[in-house]
Regions:
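STAS-typified acidic loop motif
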Residues: 48-87, 108
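Hydrophobic/aromatic residues within transmembrane alpha-helices
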Residues: 104, 167-169, 225, 287
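Long amphipathic alpha-helix in the N-terminal Rossmann-like dinucleotide-binding domain
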Residues: 133-136
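C-terminal long alpha-helix characteristic of the crotonase
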Residues: 231-298
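Patatin-like phospholipase
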Residues: 295-299, 310-321
Length: 321
C-alpha cells in the first residue's frame, strides 16, 4: 500500500487501486475502505520528490530542468487531506534548497480543489479533522508565500476551486491554460474560507472585486481572470507546456533581474509579515464555528455534495451564465 492506495498482483504485473466505495457509500482512499482487511500490509513509501520518469503510483513528484523545479501533486479530484498537505509542504521546502524557480503543476484532472470533503464526511471527528485539514492547508500556503529565496509560479492547466484557487494565488506568478475554469469562492459549501485568501485575492484584484468574486460565487475562465488581474498569463492549450517552460526559464535568464526580484520580495515580506499573518488569523477565527458547531451549514452542504444530492433546478446565480 502507498498513500491510501493498494497494489494488487496480476498475471502479467500489478495494478494500483487508489479509491473504492462500499454500496451506498462515498468514494474514499482504498486503505480507508479496506482498513480491517489489510492490517499488517506494509507501507511502500516513495521519496518526497519522487522522479516521475519511473512508472508507479505516486501522489507527489518532481522534475528538475536546470534551476527550475516542477512540483506535481496528483491528488484524486484535486482534494487534499491534512497528511497530503503536510507532505506537499515538505516537498516544496526540499526543492527550495536547489531551485531558483519552483512551478506548482497540480494534478492530471484538477489543479486543486482545497480540503478533502469526502474524508471529512467519513470521519468520526468531523470538527477536529476539518480543523486539522484547513490548518494544514494554511501551513502549506504560508510556506509558499514566505518562500523569499525562490520565485514561485503556479500552473493552472486544469480547473481549480475554493482553496485550490488560493493555493495558486499564493505564488509570485500565476499562469493558466486557455478555458481553464476557476471557482474562487467558498460560500456554496457554507464556509467563509481561509488559505490566506483575504490577503492574496485583494492583492491581485483589489478589495471591491475580491468581495464580488467571493459573494457572487460564479465561475470564471482563465481569460477573464487575466483581464481582472487575478492571474498573469494565459497560454494556448496547443503548446501550453512549451510556453510554461519558456515562461519559467525567462524568470532566471537575467541574473541581475532575478536577484533584484528576490531582494524586493524579501523586503516586501518582512514589511508585510504581520499583515499577512493577521489576514490568516482573522480567517481562521471566523471559520472555527463553521467546523465545530453541529448546526453549521457546512455539515449539511458537505453531506449533500459528497452524496451527490443535487438541486432540483439550476441555482439562480448560474442561470443564463
Amino acid at each position: 500500500k502507498r498513500d491510501g492506495a493498494i497494489c494488487l498482483g496480476t498475471i502479467d504485473g500489478a495494478i494500483w487501486i487508489t479509491h473504492l466505495k462500499v454500496k451506498n457509500g462515498i468514494k474514499l482512499p482504498a486503505t480507508y475502505v479496506l482498513k480491517e482487511k489489510i492490517q499488517g500490509v506494509k507501507e511502500n513509501r516513495l521519496s518526497l520528490t519522487f522522479d516521475m520518469s519511473y512508472k508507479t503510483f505516486y501522489e507527489i513528484g518532481s522534475h528538475k530542468d536546470g534551476d527550475v523545479s516542477y512540483l506535481c501533486f496528483n491528488f484524486h479530484n484535486g482534494a487534499m487531506n491534512s497528511e497530503q498537505a503536510i507532505r506537499l509542504k515538505y516537498a516544496f521546502e526540499y526543492l527550495k534548497e536547489t531551485a531558483k524557480v519552483i512551478v506548482l503543476i497540480g494534478a492530471r484532472d484538477f489543479f486543486s480543489n482545497g480540503i478533502h470533503l469526502n474524508i471529512l464526511e467519513d470521519s468520526q471527528k468531523q470538527g477536529e479533522d476539518g480543523w486539522s485539514n484547513i490548518n494544514a492547508m494554511n501551513d502549506l500556503i504560508k510556506s509558499i508565500i514566505f518562500a523569499d529565496d525562490v520565485i514561485t509560479v503556479s500552473s493552472l492547466h486544469r480547473n481549480a476551486g475554493a482553496g485550490g484557487v488560493f493555493l495558486a494565488l499564493a505564488c509570485d506568478y500565476v499562469v493558466g491554460k486557455e478555458n481553464t475554469v476557476l471557482n474562487p469562492h467558498y460560500k456554496t459549501m457554507g464556509l467563509s474560507g481561509s488559505e490566506y485568501h483575504t490577503y492574496s485575492l485583494p492583492k491581485r484584484v483589489g478589495q471591491k472585486k475580491a468581495d464580488e468574486l467571493l459573494k457572487n460565487c460564479l465561475p470564471l475562465s482563465t481569460q477573464k481572470a487575466k483581464k481582472i488581474g487575478m492571474i498573469d498569463e494565459v497560454f494556448s492549450h496547443t503548446d501550453y507546456f512549451d510556453s510554461l517552460r519558456s515562461y519559467a526559464t525567462s524568470l532566471i535568464d537575467d541574473e541581475d533581474k532575478y536577484d533584484d526580484f528576490i531582494y524586493d520580495k524579501e523586503d516586501y515580506l518582512e514589511e508585510n509579515k504581520k499583515y499577512i499573518n493577521d489576514c490568516k488569523e482573522n480567517e481562521i477565527k471566523i471559520m472555527y464555528p463553521e467546523f465545530w458547531e453541529e448546526t453549521s451549514l457546512f455539515h449539511k452542504l458537505r453531506y449533500d455534495f459528497v452524496y451527490k444530492n443535487s438541486s432540483s433546478e439550476t441555482p439562480k446565480r448560474l442561470k443564463g451564465y
